[in-house]
């Protein structure tokens, strides 16, 4: 069951919902008559209030069950009739709507006791209020000590009648009958006594007796987690049994007689519709949990007449839904673990591929147990699907042979299927390792003269542009702080015989005469000084990445004072260097796929990065290098798909930025949130 009813605070609606019993039970047969409990006189109520005052000297009262229209002035007028009110407050939500309860503070505990004695259950706006001493100690409210659960209450039993019935046994800290949204009794309630002994005395005296001609059950309050089956597999403690598929002609007495051989029964009922006809299910409430467990074990699945009974623990709808969710999740995990290593994820599928064609393509590599191309609501392919094999070996063979294969007009991407949580965890772990200072040692590159230094090293800098000289001699590229992708992944290195002669602008004195290309100085201090102007680098980086443009005498007309850009190609003059377009066309993508197939694997990142970086820079200029490095960690076929599909690229860039925001400290990633907001709104 749920947490115990608050001792000083009345059970809220949420709390009441948590402690709803398994199923309401109805008395099947009236036991020997029991004298109805007489209503407690005002003297008894006064004595209980005085005893509470001696034990809990408190001048603050909790006032519950208020009509939503009741405000402070209504309560002030009422309580001032008994004693001067020090202050009061009606509790409200953020929209200033009443929560249905209030706190009233008096100058001394005697006034509070007198107000509780005189005004408890007094009507305001035709609704009786419920007054208790306020107790802010959570250990007392939530302990469940002295808490009694009463069910099978008659609809005429309200809070006042329940209080008067149980107050003769001792001091009551909290008393409430559960109500529905229209104010009708749900047939059960709670009473919390100050002492455990008085609670036990009330249980011994009233359990099984008649209240308004209905036999009631009175027992200790049991938390929901104690009723449900524990994770260790212990037998759940329950007494209420649900019986389904009952014959139409069976009566309450016959149902009780059928189950009575397994233990004492407090009530048994067959549920009926408005016409009085059986609904073919009912409930049997045993006195002991052991008898209920035996009845479930013995009676479930047996035949009664022409029907096979279902007998199980009675559950609320929320409990059944939770159990079904838990069972479904376990089955899903079990099914996924069974297919672990045998289930393939396919991406970049051609629109012409359907389930039959997909199975035909992959059947040559093994026994395909299932395959599916995912469709949208219009029945069109979403471009991805799944293929499951009977064993992991067949799946690995199919992945090896089919990954990157041209199907229709698209290169197919094939990988082992992963759950979303696993993919996100892998990406997070990968980026964390990349950013870890311990993994920032120099990374060897197939291109001579290129080294990757950790951040904070002699050649580190705050920006991503790199310096590449002729034959790469003695040059070290600058890397962004805390980011460790390999140098050959950087864009700007076009496919060809060797790396381009490329240099980002840096402050120098403008030359007055055309002369030879400006050389590089190898000193680390000079190189660091060249990176001090971030704005200057960002203004000119795109020009040098995108093409040489129109230049004269090795100098660009639009370059700021003191900035001398160099040609991108050592074999061509700067004034006639062709303008390059970085937006790949379908023909370029097809040709790139062919070039990749002919090139050695160590050249693939360089070739892909040359095409990918400009597209990423258009969407995320501030962190283009970081995002490009992350995207280049993906499979080659998927990168080709990103080059071809702007929507897919934008989604991946957003995903990479999300990882950056979660993993990088604010100093490591510049304006990630602002840039991401801009790119998402475009």
Swiss-Prot record:
Tissue and organ distribution: Expressed predominantly in immature flowers but also at lower levels in mature flowers and siliques. Detected in tapetum, pollen, ovules and developing seeds. Also detected in primary inflorescences and immature siliques.
GO cellular component: cytosol; mitochondrion; nucleus
Transmembrane domains' residue ranges: none
Domain RRM: from-to ranges: 59-136, 146-223, 239-316, 342-419
CDD domains recorded: RRM2_I_PABPs (cd12379), RRM3_I_PABPs (cd12380), RRM4_I_PABPs (cd12381)
PABC domain mapped to chain residues: 588-665
Gene Ontology biological process terms, A to Z: nuclear-transcribed mRNA poly(A) tail shortening; regulation of translation; translational initiation
Keywords: Cytoplasm, Nucleus, Phosphoprotein, Repeat, RNA-binding, Translation regulation
PANTHER family according to UniProt: RNA BINDING PROTEIN
Other known facts: A.thaliana contains 8 PABP genes.
Name of the protein: Polyadenylate-binding protein 5
Source organism per UniProt: Arabidopsis thaliana
């Amino acid at each position: 069951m749920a947490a115990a009813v608050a001792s000083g605070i009345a059970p809220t609606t949420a709390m009441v919902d948590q402690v709803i019993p398994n199923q309401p039970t109805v008395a099947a047969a009236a036991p020997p008559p029991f004298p109805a409990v007489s209503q407690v006189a005002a003297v008894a109520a006064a004595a209980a209030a005085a005893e509470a005052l001696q034990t809990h000297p408190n001048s603050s009262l909790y006032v519950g069950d208020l009509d939503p229209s009741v405000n402070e002035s209504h309560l002030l007028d009422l309580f001032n009739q008994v004693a001067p009110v020090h202050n009061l407050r009606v509790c409200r939500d953020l929209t200033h709507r009443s929560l249905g309860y209030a706190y009233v503070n008096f100058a001394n505990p005697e006034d509070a006791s007198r107000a509780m004695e005189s005004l408890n259950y007094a009507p305001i706006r035709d609704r009786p209020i419920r007054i208790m001493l306020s107790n802010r100690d959570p250990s007392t409210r939530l302990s469940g000590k002295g808490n009694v659960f009463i069910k099978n209450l008659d609809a005429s039993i309200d809070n006042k009648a329940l209080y008067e019935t149980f107050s003769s046994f001792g001091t009551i800290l909290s008393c409430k009958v559960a109500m529905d949204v229209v104010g009708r009794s749900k047939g059960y309630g709670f009473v919390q006594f100050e002492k455990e002994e008085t609670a036990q005395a009330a249980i011994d005296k009233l359990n099984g007796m008649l209240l308004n001609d209905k036999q009631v059950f009175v027992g200790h309050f049991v938390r929901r987690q104690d009723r449900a089956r524990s994770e260790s597999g212990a037998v759940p403690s329950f007494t209420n049994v649900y019986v389904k598929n009952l014959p139409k002609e069976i009566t309450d007495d016959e149902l009780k007689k059928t189950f009575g051989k397994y233990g004492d029964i407090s009530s048994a009922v067959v549920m009926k519709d408005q016409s009085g006809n059986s609904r073919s299910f009912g409930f049997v409430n045993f006195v002991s949990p052991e008898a209920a467990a035996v009845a479930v074990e013995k009676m479930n699945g047996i035949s009664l007449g022409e029907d096979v009974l279902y007998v199980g623990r009675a559950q609320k709808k929320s409990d059944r839904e939770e159990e079904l969710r838990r069972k479904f999740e376990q089955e899903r995990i079990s099914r996924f673990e069974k297919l672990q290593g045998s289930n393939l994820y396919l991406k970049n599928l051609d629109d012409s591929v359907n389930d039959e064609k997909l199975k035909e393509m992959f059947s040559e590599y093994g026994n395909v147990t299932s395959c599916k191309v995912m469709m949208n609501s219009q029945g069109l392919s979403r471009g991805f699907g799944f293929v499951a094999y009977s064993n992991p070996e067949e799946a690995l063979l199919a992945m090896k042979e089919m990954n990157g294969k041209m199907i229709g007009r698209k290169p197919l991407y094939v990988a082992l299927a992963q759950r979303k949580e696993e993919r996100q965890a892998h990406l997070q772990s990968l980026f964390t390792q990349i950013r870890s200072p311990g993994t920032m040692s120099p990374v060897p590159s197939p291109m001579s003269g290129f080294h990757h230094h950790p951040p904070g090293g002699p050649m580190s800098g705050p920006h991503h542009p790199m310096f590449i000289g002729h034959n790469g001699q003695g040059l070290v590229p600058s890397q962004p702080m805390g980011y460790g992708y390999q140098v050959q992944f950087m864009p700007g290195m076009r496919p060809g015989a060797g790396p381009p002669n490329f240099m980002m602008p840096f402050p120098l004195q403008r030359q007055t005469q055309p002369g030879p290309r400006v050389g590089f100085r190898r000193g680390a201090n000079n190189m660091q000084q060249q990176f001090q102007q971030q704005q200057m680098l960002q203004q000119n980086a795109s020009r040098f990445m995108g093409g040489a443009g129109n230049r004269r005498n090795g100098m660009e007309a639009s370059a700021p004072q003191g900035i001398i850009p160099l040609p991108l190609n050592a074999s061509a003059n700067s004034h006639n260097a062709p303008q390059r377009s970085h937006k790949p066309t379908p023909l370029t993508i097809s040709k790139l796929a062919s070039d990749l197939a002919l090139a050695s694997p160590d050249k693939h990142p360089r070739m892909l990065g040359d095409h990918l970086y400009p597209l990423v820079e258009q969407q995320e200029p501030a962190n283009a290098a970081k995002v490009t490095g992350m995207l280049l960690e993906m499979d080659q076929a998927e990168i080709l798909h990103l080059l071809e599909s702007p929507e897919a690229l934008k989604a991946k860039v957003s995903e990479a930025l999300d990882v950056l925001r979660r993993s990088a400290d604010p100093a490591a990633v510049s304006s990630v949130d602002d840039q991401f907001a801009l790119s998402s709104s475009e």
